[in-house]
């Protein structure tokens, strides 16, 4: 069904194009992808004719900052966190819309010697800012384009375009397979790109391991750092988790208010303690504690979201009012930590389908979902209903 990442790299190095599809639980879309530095009028015309989507140029954060490409909007509500900047045309262009002029703009955006003054704003080409760490941090087409460019030894920028069917609907894998065969293009998945990078790169470092006696039992606490954002994470390990048998795992996002202060606004604290109790009872398991306060928006922004909830907004609406997706968490770092601990198959303590998809996208096998439902109280009943209705959490309320 899909070609290998090596085949895709070979095609791109030769100046060609590939088709890249993401996870069916994410956008479930395919994009044409080429290197920005080799973009030609023919590249742009092909994408516009056969892709029919928006032609964008994924860049590194450093290049976008150097070219002074500000965010398209100050508060994005895109649930996938796509980081559009202001659109541009190269200063040498006329209208900027022709395939020839868009190709010139695309190549210039990849040029390490380009200057902010080389571009007119707004324009007809849409830069996107890739997350540092690429698909190991965010499993999107933006990051895939920059990762492929780096793997090719090219300037770290790509050009992408979503693929639609002739009737205007989004092309899914069966249609993308036909298109790839018609035009002799490798069809690859972001999941395979993640696996490829995981085999050749490591972004987490095991720093130190200690014994940690707790009120629930004795654990080994393993401290990790990562090279993407420098954040620290902790794995509380019980027993031998690297023997190949499925391991009971809880990936828990930091919640100062719930975990430490006992806040009743959420169910985080009770979930944390229940997970530790369950792991201790089984005699084997891992609780991974991630620095993802407020579903990834940070402590102060979580307080701002709480303030909006006091004014009548629910937890999802509050995040969106602040310009954040409903859930900003990413699972690549956690997945690498679990693999470092020797875990491949797991029984995941979660109610969140997005967490399942996020970890499986990093080549981890979830053999069972173990529910972790806490009894609702008056203070968090609306919060839990919102998680079920708007975020798809599997809760019985």
UniProtKB/Swiss-Prot annotation:
GO terms for biological process: riboflavin biosynthetic process. Its cofactor is Mg(2+); Mn(2+); Zn(2+). Mg(2+) 1 binds at residue 27. GTP binds at residues 250-254, 271, 293-295, 315, 350, 355. The record marks 124, 162 as: Essential for DHBP synthase activity. Residues 200-397 are annotated as: GTP cyclohydrolase II. Pathway: Cofactor biosynthesis; riboflavin biosynthesis; 2-hydroxy-3-oxobutyl phosphate from D-ribulose 5-phosphate: step 1/1; Cofactor biosynthesis; riboflavin biosynthesis; 5-amino-6-(D-ribitylamino)uracil from GTP: step 1/4. InterPro entries: DHBP_synth_RibB-like_a/b_dom (IPR017945), DHBP_synthase_RibB (IPR000422), GTP_cyclohydro_II (IPR032677), RibA (IPR000926), RibA-like_sf (IPR036144), Riboflavin_synth_RibBA (IPR016299). GO terms for molecular function: 3,4-dihydroxy-2-butanone-4-phosphate synthase activity; GTP binding; GTP cyclohydrolase II activity; magnesium ion binding; manganese ion binding; zinc ion binding. It catalyses: D-ribulose 5-phosphate = (2S)-2-hydroxy-3-oxobutyl phosphate + formate + H(+); GTP + 4 H2O = 2,5-diamino-6-hydroxy-4-(5-phosphoribosylamino)-pyrimidine + formate + 2 phosphate + 3 H(+). The active site is at residues 327, 329. Catalyzes the conversion of D-ribulose 5-phosphate to formate and 3,4-dihydroxy-2-butanone 4-phosphate. Catalyzes the conversion of GTP to 2,5-diamino-6-ribosylamino-4(3H)-pyrimidinone 5'-phosphate (DARP), formate and pyrophosphate. Its EC number is 4.1.99.12, 3.5.4.25. Mg(2+) 2 binds at residues 27, 141. Residues 1-199 are annotated as: DHBP synthase. Zn(2+) binds at residues 255, 266, 268. In the N-terminal section; belongs to the DHBP synthase family. Binds 2 divalent metal cations per subunit. Magnesium or manganese. Binds 1 zinc ion per subunit. Disulfide bonds: none annotated. D-ribulose 5-phosphate binds at residues 26-27, 31, 138-142, 162. This is Riboflavin biosynthesis protein RibBA. Keywords: GTP-binding, Hydrolase, Lyase, Magnesium, Manganese, Metal-binding, Multifunctional enzyme, Nucleotide-binding, Riboflavin biosynthesis, Zinc.
């Amino acid at each position: 069904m899909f070609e290998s990442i090596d085949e895709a790299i070979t095609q791109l190095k030769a100046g060609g194009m590939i088709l890249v599809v993401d996870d069916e639980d994410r956008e479930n879309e395919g994009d044409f992808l080429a290197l920005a530095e080799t973009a030609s009028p023919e590249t742009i015309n092909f994408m516009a004719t056969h892709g029919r989507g928006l032609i964008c140029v994924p860049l590194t954060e450093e290049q976008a900052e150097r070219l002074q490409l500000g965010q398209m909007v100050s508060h994005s509500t895109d649930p996938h966190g796509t980081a559009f900047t202001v659109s541009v045309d190269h200063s040498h262009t006329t209208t900027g819309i022709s395939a020839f002029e868009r190709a010139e703009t695309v190549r210039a955006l990849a040029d390490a010697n380009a200057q902010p003054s080389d571009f007119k704003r707004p324009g007809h080409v849409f830069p996107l800012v890739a997350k540092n760490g690429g698909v190991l941090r965010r499993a999107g087409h933006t990051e895939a384009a920059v990762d492929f460019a780096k793997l090719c030894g090219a300037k770290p920028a790509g050009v992408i375009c979503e693929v639609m069917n002739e009737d205007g609907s989004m092309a899914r894998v069966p249609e993308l397979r036909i298109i790839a065969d018609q035009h002799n293009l490798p069809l690859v998945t972001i999941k395979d790109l993640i696996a490829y990078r995981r085999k050749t790169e490591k972004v987490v470092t095991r720093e130190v391991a200690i014994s940690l006696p707790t009120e629930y039992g004795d654990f080994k606490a393993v401290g990790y750092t990562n090279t993407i954002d420098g954040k620290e994470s902790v794995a509380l390990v019980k027993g031998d988790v690297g023997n190949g048998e499925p391991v009971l795992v809880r990936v828990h996002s930091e919640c100062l208010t719930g975990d430490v202060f006992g806040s009743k606004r959420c169910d985080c604290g009770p979930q944390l303690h229940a997970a530790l109790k369950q792991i201790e009872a089984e005699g084997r398991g891992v609780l991974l504690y991630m620095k993802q306060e407020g579903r990834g928006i940070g402590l102060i922004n979580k307080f701002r979201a709480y303030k909006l909830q006091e004014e009548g907004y629910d937890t999802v609406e509050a995040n969106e009012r602040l310009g954040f997706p409903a859930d900003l968490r990413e699972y690549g770092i956690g997945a690498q930590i679990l693999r470092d601990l020797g875990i491949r198959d797991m029984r995941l303590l979660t109610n969140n389908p997005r967490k399942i998809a996020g970890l499986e996208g990093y080549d981890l096998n979830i053999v069972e979902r173990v529910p972790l439902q806490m009894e609702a109280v008056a203070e968090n009943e609306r919060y839990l209903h919102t998680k079920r209705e708007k975020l798809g959490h599997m809760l019985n309320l």
